[in-house]
Amino acid sequence: MSGVDQIVKTFADLAEDDREAAMRAFSRMMRRGTEPVRRIPAAKKKVNGFMGFRSYYSPLFSQLPQKERSPFMTILWQHDPFHNEWDFMCSVYSSIRTYLEQEKVTLQLWIHYAVGHLGVIIRDNYMASFGWNLVRFPNGTHDLERTALPLVQHNLQPMNGLCLLTKCLESGLPLANPHSVIAKLSDPSYDMIWFNKRPHRQQGHAVQTDESEVGVSAMFPRNHTVAAEVDGIINLPLSHWIQQGEFGTESGYSAQFETLLDSILENGHASSNDPYNMALAIDVPMMGFNGGA
């Protein structure tokens, strides 16, 4: 007797109540088998600084075809002095992207609120601020021409991902339920101070200088006592901050240093009457582009 015949015979020999119970069991099994398989969505690609830069500034060339627009965006990026800021901004976005997309916050909207807190030039002022002109030739092609070389200043800005999110929320970032995002960025692994200067290494979205003594020497006079205190704080391990609590609250630092640090943490820069050079100036390289036809 075949397997099918055996099943039919067994089913026929069942009492009526047992037969109905078996039918219900078979029906449930069939429904489970026909349900669509739930696919786990693939992890989305991390957004890097150039992707964010291109997304934000590309509308500057909206009147041009894509084949002309892309090379111009590459040229602007190569000579943009805010690579660290863009990497940081987009790395924070990547780490909370799932939460933001649930509330319809796109990359463009995130950047709109974030750029102002990192000193990045807004889109409408970008070309004029960096001396760029879009030139149109008689044959209809275009090129970029640079007519001015501005001096770009980077202020010392202690900041982490949670700080950037908080500033964006305060300036109007539309998140109906920000608590889950705040919890994500409150994890100790994200709680490193980010300094706006090169060279750097990137851990998650927190950027920390490799050679703190180089950065400190650019801000303070040689052998100044405050410089030694800042350098000591920069090199403290993450575990120290988790144990100690808020940044710079330990006892033993000079009143001069604590006053300076309070000004930086509250305002993003030193007070106007502070004698130290808190602006790290970087010259934008001189470059001309004229591929005339």
From Swiss-Prot:
GO terms for molecular function: DNA binding, bending. The keyword Transcription regulation applies. One of its GO terms (cellular component) is nucleus. The keyword Zinc does not apply. Disulfide bonds: none annotated. GO terms for biological process: positive regulation of mating-type specific transcription, DNA-templated. Coiled coil: none annotated. Residues 42-97 bind DNA. Keywords: DNA-binding, Nucleus, Transcription, Transcription regulation. Pfam families: MATalpha_HMGbox. It is found in: Nucleus. Belongs to the MATALPHA1 family. Mating type proteins are sequence specific DNA-binding proteins that act as master switches in yeast differentiation by controlling gene expression in a cell type-specific fashion. Transcriptional activator that induces the transcription of A-specific genes like mating factor ccg-4. Required for mating as an A-cell and for blocking of heterokaryon formation (vegetative incompatibility). This is Mating-type protein A-1.
